[in-house]
């Protein structure tokens, strides 16, 4: 049976939200998976020695996920009663993968999730980046193209940037300790934005934002226990992470420019070679005996077909 958001989980991918989240959770943890869907991630967690409890609103999907989970609570994440079924259970990791953007009140749901984090535990969240360059360029064209999945999934109710994601976590009592990014180059998302519709200067301006090609944010956060030293250290780690990301983006853009320049230079070299070959063929034609024999006839033909100059008079006829 096919379910909404059925996906294949590649835990070893270097540019995938599921892989990033699984890497943050690790092995042999107790996990609360909020929005477990049909259990694709649940299965990998179980294979890694994790004990999983899921929350899922779709009963059919929940039954599928139950194959790998210790149990699955069926209900709406925004319903207090759904959380009440968990009792006082706490977990080493609480996962919310592409969940919060679908909620009317993501902050309330996140606060409830934080209440189920065990001491020393973590919260792992993935969110799409509404500030991706393709969304910005679509807006410049007056478009907001909803899709079945992706950045503008038609079921999204809330939208997040890097800053609003951080604000959400802080308001929920979390401190972000690690941030990873799923990267999707401009003009390669499901939105169908076309490069030829935009001036290169505009594109370059958008790319000056290091997050312009960030498709999803994946963050690992811990509960803020009021330890200012921990918060300061987390903030410093976030700054360093951003610096590494920004430097990586800068170098990637530089490499892209160098590659484009190299391609242009190669095209110029090809054109030069083509011109030299054409000149060689033309010189060879000039040197042929046939060309020399017909040269006087070509000159005569040119004189006969030359247009008459303004003001010129025909030569007088001889008596």
PLM regions and their residue ranges:
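S-adenosyl-L-methionine-dependent methyltransferase catalytic module, highlighting the catalytic core
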Residues: 7, 15-16, 40, 60-63, ...
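Conserved alpha-helix/loop element of class I SAM-dependent methyltransferases that forms part
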Residues: 12-29
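Class I SAM-dependent methyltransferase "Motif I" SAM/SAH-binding loop
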Residues: 35-37
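Class I SAM-dependent methyltransferase SAM/SAH-binding core
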Residues: 40, 44-81
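A short acidic, Gly/Pro-enriched loop at the edge of an enzyme's catalytic core
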Residues: 83-93
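A short beta-strand submotif of the Rossmann-like class I SAM-dependent methyltransferase core
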Residues: 93-99
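Boundary detector for helix-to-coil junctions that initiate low-complexity/charged tails
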Residues: 224-319
């Amino acid at each position: 049976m096919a379910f909404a958001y059925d996906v294949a989980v590649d835990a070893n991918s270097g540019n995938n939200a599921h892989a990033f989240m699984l890497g943050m959770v690790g092995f042999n943890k107790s996990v609360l998976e909020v929005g477990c869907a049909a259990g694709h991630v649940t299965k990998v967690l179980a294979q890694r020695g994790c004990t999983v409890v899921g929350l899922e609103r779709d009963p059919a999907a929940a039954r599928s996920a139950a194959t790998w989970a210790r149990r699955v609570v069926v209900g709406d994440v925004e319903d207090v009663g759904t959380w009440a079924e968990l009792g006082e259970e706490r977990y080493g990791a609480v996962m919310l993968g592409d969940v919060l953007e679908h909620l009317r009140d993501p902050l309330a749901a996140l606060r409830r999730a934080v209440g189920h984090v065990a001491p020393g535990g973590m919260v792992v969240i993935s969110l799409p980046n509404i500030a991706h360059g393709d969304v910005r360029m679509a807006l410049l064209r007056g478009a907001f193209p909803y899709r079945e999945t992706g950045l503008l999934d038609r079921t999204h109710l809330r939208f997040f940037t890097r800053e609003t994601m951080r604000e959400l976590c802080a308001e929920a009592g979390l401190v972000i300790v690690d941030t990873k990014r799923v990267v999707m180059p401009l003009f390669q998302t499901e939105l169908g934005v076309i490069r030829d519709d935009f001036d290169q200067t505009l594109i370059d301006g958008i790319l000056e934002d290091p997050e312009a090609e960030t498709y999803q944010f994946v963050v690992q956060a811990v509960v803020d226990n009021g330890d200012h030293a921990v918060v300061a250290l987390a903030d410093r780690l976030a700054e360093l992470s951003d610096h590494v990301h920004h430097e990586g983006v800068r170098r990637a853009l530089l490499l892209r420019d160098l590659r484009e320049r190299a391609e242009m230079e190669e095209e110029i070299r090809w054109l030069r070679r083509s011109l030299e070959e054409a000149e060689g063929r033309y010189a060879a034609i000039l040197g042929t005996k046939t060309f020399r024999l017909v040269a006087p006839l070509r000159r005569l033909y040119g004189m006969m077909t030359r247009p008459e100059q303004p003001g010129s008079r025909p030569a007088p006829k001889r008596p």
